[in-house]
């Protein structure tokens, strides 16, 4: 699982999800990438599930890059707990994804297989996304 080794503060505020990504919007390492089209929190489990889906489809001969890291804790209070008495304990680690951000990159010789693998990964993520290549990017 992807979680930070050490954090300065155990709990954080929840940022507003607005604006578009300023960095990480191009495919830099591989030939194909998954680009987000909307705002979302993506958890460490969803990232891992998408990575496994890609690796199982391409088997061998390709390389996958994960360009996002869940560095923000989300808290939750226990069930049937009254309001008040402080903030809940950290439950998940998430990354705040903005539109235009490239989440995964893939290098693979066959374009059809690469697109099929990335499509499977998109189905594991809680956002609308599209497949971009190194040539066609916005």
UniProtKB/Swiss-Prot annotation:
Spell out the molecular function terms from Gene Ontology: rRNA binding; structural constituent of ribosome; tRNA binding
State the superkingdom. Answer: Bacteria
- Locate the compositionally biased regions of type Basic residues: 1-17
Q: Which InterPro entries match?
A: Ribosomal_uL16, Ribosomal_uL16_bact-type, Ribosomal_uL16_CS, Ribosomal_uL16_dom, Ribosomal_uL16_sf
Q: Which GO terms describe its biological process?
A: translation
The UniProt entry, under PROSITE patterns, shows: RIBOSOMAL_L16_1 (PS00586), RIBOSOMAL_L16_2 (PS00701)
Keywords in alphabetical order, please: Ribonucleoprotein, Ribosomal protein, RNA-binding, rRNA-binding, tRNA-binding
What is the protein name given in its UniProt record?
Answer: Large ribosomal subunit protein uL16
* Gene source species: Mycobacterium leprae (strain TN)
Supply the gene name. Answer: rplP
């Amino acid at each position: 699982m992807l979680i930070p080794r050490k954090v300065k503060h155990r709990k954080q505020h929840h940022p507003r999800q607005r604006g578009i990504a300023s960095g990480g919007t191009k495919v830099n390492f591989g030939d194909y990438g998954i680009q987000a089209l909307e705002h979302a929190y993506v958890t460490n489990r969803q990232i891992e599930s998408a990575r496994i889906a890609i690796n199982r489809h391409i088997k061998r001969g390709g390389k996958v890059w994960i360009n996002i890291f869940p560095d923000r804790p989300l808290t939750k209070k226990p069930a049937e707990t009254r309001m008040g008495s402080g903030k809940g304990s950290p439950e998940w680690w998430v990354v705040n994804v903005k539109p235009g951000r490239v989440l995964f990159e893939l290098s693979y010789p066959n374009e059809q297989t690469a697109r099929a693998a990335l499509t499977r990964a998109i189905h594991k993520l809680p956002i609308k996304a599209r497949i971009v290549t190194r040539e066609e990017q916005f």
